[in-house]
Amino acid sequence: MRYKTSLVMRKRLRLYRNTLKESSSSSGHHGPQLTAASSPSVFPGLHEEPPQASPSRPLNGLLRLGLPGDMYARPEPFPPGPAARSDALAAAAALHGYGGMNLTVNLAAPHGPGAFFRYMRQPIKQELICKWLAADGTATPSLCSKTFSTMHELVTHVTVEHVGGPEQANHICFWEECPRQGKPFKAKYKLVNHIRVHTGEKPFPCPFPGCGKVFARSENLKIHKRTHTGEKPFRCEFEGCERRFANSSDRKKHSHVHTSDKPYTCKVRGCDKCYTHPSSLRKHMKVHGRSPPPSSGYDSATPSALVSPSSDCGHKSQVASSAAVAARTADLSE
């Protein structure tokens, strides 16, 4: 049986060589222009799909040569050997009339469902626009409006072209609609940190595996890492309290429990509720169907949006706080 198969293959190979000689002598092309209908006897395996193959699979690994099939299907798990590659090149040249150097351009196979996934895999080009108001000698500053494809390019442009070097005496943010409204910073690094609010740059990633959080300031990253390490370096300053906190802001909020100070007051008209902790105020605001303005949990200052100095509750809490501090001072002096 094996001898009979070998004999058949030799006859087909001999027939193929004779066909090449005849076509090359009568045509000036790189290879014979045999159509799929005229050569089934030479390469029957190239035109007959195996029964177990589905339309979404490549045929015999010849997908890369422009043969009909799903051009976006996954490649074979094992690359073909040198003999298979040479046979494939010869077959493609015979079927399409292309030489070996032109096979890369012959990929116009019928588009299958994989074309959609190829489109989805294309990277989405983003444009980052510089909205710095640059003075150009006129009364009204003009918008920079330069576009960049990466965050690094935008940040470098703003830092070098607009913020400037040490020769700049006034560290003012001229970003469009900046809420500081021309109020200068005391140092250049503070201005650079502030600009990240506008650009969205967050150059400080969490180093712990699987976290994935990034931060705009190194101080915030330092505080965040304590959630992984469990470090709580800020101890409550009141005697007898062993509570510890990861940042000074949480410790300050906790201190209101000891002083009876309630600086977080409800801003809704007619409501005089006040609380010692902002979380209690957030729960209360749900009664009104509102939520207090968001504030960073890493700020050491009390959120001004939540404090009402004119409130009676706030005044009473300040009096109670002063009395508690005075009593504690008297105890320590004794």
Curated annotation (Swiss-Prot):
Residues 20-60, 282-334 are annotated as: Disordered. Signal peptide: none annotated. GO terms for molecular function: DNA binding; DNA-binding transcription factor activity, RNA polymerase II-specific; RNA polymerase II cis-regulatory region sequence-specific DNA binding; sequence-specific double-stranded DNA binding; zinc ion binding. It is found in: Nucleus. GO terms for biological process: central nervous system development; regulation of transcription by RNA polymerase II. GO terms for cellular component: nucleus. It holds the Pfam family zf_ZIC. Residues 297-311 have a biased composition (Polar residues). Keywords: DNA-binding, Metal-binding, Nucleus, Repeat, Zinc, Zinc-finger. A zinc finger (C2H2-type) spans 128-162, 171-198, 204-228, 234-258, 264-288. Coiled coil: none annotated. Belongs to the GLI C2H2-type zinc-finger protein family. PANTHER family: GLIS FAMILY ZINC FINGER 2, TRANSCRIPTIONAL ACTIVATOR CUBITUS INTERRUPTUS. Binds to DNA. This is Zinc finger protein ZIC 4. It comes from Homo sapiens.
